[in-house]
Amino acid sequence: MDKRVFGVETEFGCLVADENLGNPEQIVEEIKDHLFYDKKIGLIDHHARDDVFEPAESGGFLLNGARLYVDAVGSHLEYATAECQSLKDLVANDRAGQRLIVQALHDLGLAEDCAIYNNSVDHFGGHTFGCHENYLVRAEGELMNGTLHLLIPFLVTRQVYAGVGRVGGHVLFEGDAPTYEQLSQNPIDYIWVSHVYGVAPDPSVKFQLSQRADHILRTIASKVRFNRAIVNPKWETMYSQNGMTRLHLLFGEANQNEYGYALKIGTTALAIRACESGLISHDFLLAQPLVALRDISRDDSFQWLLELQDGSIVSALDLQSRYLEACQAFKGESDQNDWILTEWERTLNDLKADPMQMGDRLDWVAKKLICEEYMASEQIGWEDDALQSVDLEYHNIDPAASLFYGWQEMGRSKRLLRDLDIMVAQADAPKDTRAHGRSKLVEHVLKRKGAPIYTFDWSSVQVDRQRFTQLPEPLDPYANPLDQWGQPIFGDK
């Protein structure tokens, strides 16, 4: 596919310093209710999308084309971006969601004692928070029917520029089967971490590239609730009624740096296309993908060596260069493709020269530098627990409190966006995907007097049980979605 949409789902953690304000589960409900009922940034679902995981009024679609909800598994906030074709639109839409959440904290007077984080691991409890990527692919195409495994080496090695960095590590071990009493009295994520497998700190690891590498158990898995994998194929047609589906990538992390975020999504989109186009050789395949995943993340020598299926030893940078070379076939097709290819090559060259000079572009480098500066000022070592707090505060999404945004304010982080871009994206959906049409329908229902009955989904909208609009094509902006209903709309003017 020469054109595709992509989107990112991010799960957020919440910390509450003042227990008198309530627990984190109560705080995220307050944030959600404030945004939908008071600020009216979207339409809250009055139906259950899932009786267990997304009951009625757990969230809904927003004016900017995205979706915000409280995931019942862990009771955490989750934000799914609008469908995007442009990397700039994607990063802006993602950051817009964060700004809306932060503004709610301030509106509610909670910002001093509550914080929201896009970190991907809990250092102490062993829980992880997902940052999942979605890419439009053909359900009957080459990727989903024979070449998906050729994408795995790319995903394993892209952490050299896509990783967000992590202080310390975890060791997993087999857990005991939970009792019926524990199943009934505890949330699913507690059962998952405490019983499906056990988690313990690994004191041998000072710092690593990835927050989630220690927790990945499979390369490809169709069922992922208790089976963390790199890729979830999503054998479904929810993205389109014309033979399209979504590729759901589970091994990823929430990038703070705009450049690193865009590079991760852009290179992955091109690598997917290369696999679809038959440009990737079986010579790229890894001998042990999960071993390589952890070894690369934990290699503090930055050699990042791994073994291929043919027995040869190559570096992660060399393997990334092979994917880059294959993707040069798409050079000249668009400004976006050319940016991706140019920056991909520049990043690999700079990583070969000196990774620690890339703190302006890569999250793991910036975080490591911040930790080292803190250690020098406090005269402590990597074993000090204070560094786990530094790690966490890097991912505070409030620009007024985040270590990352402090880094950015000092001019030490490369930006792709203006603050104005993020502000606009809080209310406006991307104009070249179906998110545009869906947002127009959200806007229309919000303006309507009374209390209409409605059901919104990614690809369809129903209002008053009589008006139904389909939005099957992700690449169609549906400039006039109300026309499908005829006149008058909803029976009012």
Q: Which stretches of residues belong to each language-model region?
A:
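Internal, well-ordered domain-core segments that constitute the primary functional module
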Residues: H106, E112-T219
